[in-house]
Amino acid sequence: MIRRRTFIKGGLALAATPAMARAQGKGKVKLAYLQLGWAATEIIHKEDLLGRHGWQAEYSVVPGAPGPLLNQLASRNVDAIDMSFALAAKAFEDGVPLRVTGVATAVLGAIIARKDAGLSRVEDLKGRKVAAVVGTSTFFDIRALTLKGYGFDLQKDTQIVTATAPPDMVTLLGKKEVDAIIAWQPITDAVVLRGEGVYLAKQIDLWRKATGRPTGFPVHVCYLVHNEFLTKNPGIARDLNDAQRDAVEIWYGKPERAIEIVQDVTKLPKEVVQVAYKETVKMLSGLPDEQVDTLIVQLKINKEFGFLKSDIWENPDRIRREFFYRA
């Protein structure tokens, strides 16, 4: 079990940007997000979409792995964050006072094989060296789905090489020190674009095989709001979802602007962002009934395969009441 202090420890480098003073009658809100989160939160930031919904918003871009960002919410340094869904559930059961208020993007993960590693099937990974950021939701999700869909354990049946952040995995693959990596967009797309790796399996395909669900979108990134802030400002849940909806409209309706924003925040080459944009499974917003049903299945799988421990994940009514917040 990865305990809370293990995966949320670490420092934080914030690049805080006060939003423009537009229609700020609802008060202040601090929204932080991952630099490589790939959730359209960049668009909320650069277009100040929370400002359009009446908030005086301060946006912070957080580099690296998700742990330090989650720690910022737990310590109330920020009011809301984007976060991988599995880590959100883990933090909740470990006592972090948070609620899931909406979703941001469908699963982004993939297993990328080194081009000359001789891997053509997921089963070929047995006994091979695989790099992963072990504390991330992508690793745990893909491990659970591989267990359920293929019957073998990536953590036990391969040689896991632990990385601290996505760029480390890219370096390991480039040096041929590993045969494959378990990562997420846009890192996966950058590796493929450079010709160093090929897609062995995408997380969405692993999900469909493991669950037998041909429709619906499992979620990689969701929005979390600290309970204290949410209690005092319940309207933030609706407004954050509306801002995300606006961002998704820009993502699909104005792709050139979306790519420009993402490139500015991630600092990735334009051609990488363009490929990752095309490979994105689905940008999402809100918390509709059918999405909640899919999220509950995700939680059940993570409980079944040991990442989550609490009995709450076996009780859909409690999940809806205590973990989600629907405006």
Task: Annotate each PLM feature.
Residues 6-23:
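N-terminal export signals
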Residues 300-327:
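Conserved C-terminal helix/tail region of periplasmic/extracytoplasmic solute-binding proteins
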Residues 86-87, 168-171, 175-261:
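Pocket-lining segment of extracytoplasmic ligand-binding domains
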Residues 24-163, 179-185, 196, 201:
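Short, glycine-/small- and polar/acidic-enriched structural segments
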Residues 153-159, 266-277, 309-316:
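Short, surface-exposed acidic
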Residues 52-53, 204-216, 282-291:
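Short, solvent-exposed loop/beta-turn-alpha elements that line the ligand-binding surface or hinge
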Residues 231-307:
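Secondary-structure end/capping motifs
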